[in-house]
């Protein structure tokens, strides 16, 4: 059963990816358990246990573990979700503002969650996470709506509009150049002023159309002529130009407005609504906030931080946190962390192995002890003696203290429920399944 197969490395990389996709966490666990299962399977092969029997035992053990995970879980409320977020943020450079960021992440997830009879569904695309260097992390905000990295086109325009009626325009608000780029022969000064008057009148008409529709806010995907800007500001209209296509679509969804390609077609029915559109100074630049959108399925989070590096770190940590909170909210169950549940499952599987006859029993026992690689690794990372830690952990679990695990930050075996270290059950479930499937696949290759 000589390992070192070229496919093994790629397979292990694959499980890491699957784990990341499904759970945003626990990638290391999946890979570490898979490696340990392979080590144990070699020992079994040396004792003349056939790979097919090992595969069957691993499968039985994995299924049993997944079935038993629920017995170790507890229900989820908002407070519990905050603890899950805090656990995800622990040990990252955002440590000091953990409480603050975990609150924002839970609020963001709960405001986009769709609830139905079967439970909750969270689409993380509905949380737009933006970062802006400057200020401190505590200046980060959650906005019920959309943030545009833009400023109004003319300083004479209002900085803020309440009860915004928004025209979403996908054409330039400027004079259309004559189709044939003819040099217009202007021989007489009167002709020039007449020509300019016509341009002016054309732009004035365009702005009148906007005013007639009832719009007081214009978000334009293309350019806006200087003169048109001037007329708009005279009419008290707030306007942005060159908005991103993705922002236009998000605005359309949130405000209920329709994107029009031609101002001639603009009518009141096309307008989107928001309770407020406002330009605010964020750091060194201005950004526009569109808030209180009636159909907003999405929220925006603006993350701040003193340097580029800090903002990037905060964004990475925050995205992990919302990912894990979303999973916990969808599953409606969380587990205590620190390897506590893995240790409990290891004990459960030892008992399960005793009730199983046949040679699979050895494989289930091997699976049970392979799981202990997780608390062992945690102990090593915390600078604790791994052997003593496992002994302490087994002792605690044999006394029914099934929430005891390894606390990396305080060092030692403690009650993880008291230490408030929690993770979604899906993370542990997926890690065990992925590890088992990978080990079985590689055993088959070598069989």
Task: Place the predicted regions along the sequence by residue.
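Glycine/charge-rich, flexible interdomain linkers and switch-proximal surface loops
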Residues: 29, 75-85, 121-130, 385-408
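Metallocofactor- and cofactor-centric catalytic cores in central/energy metabolism, strongly enriched
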Residues: 9, 20, 56, 68, ...
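N-terminal cofactor/phosphate-binding cores enriched in small/glycine residues
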Residues: 1-36
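Short glycine/serine/threonine-rich phosphate/pyrophosphate-binding segments
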Residues: 23-31, 177-178, 225-227, 248-249, ...
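Hydrophobic, well-structured modules enriched for small/aliphatic residues and gly/pro motifs
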Residues: 21-30, 43, 47-61, 65
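Extended amphipathic alpha-helical scaffolds
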Residues: 60-306, 313
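Extended, low-charge hydrophobic alpha-helical regions
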Residues: 4-6, 298-302, 306-447
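Alpha-helical transmembrane segments of multi-pass membrane proteins, especially transporters
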Residues: 27, 31-32, 52-59, 361-369, ...
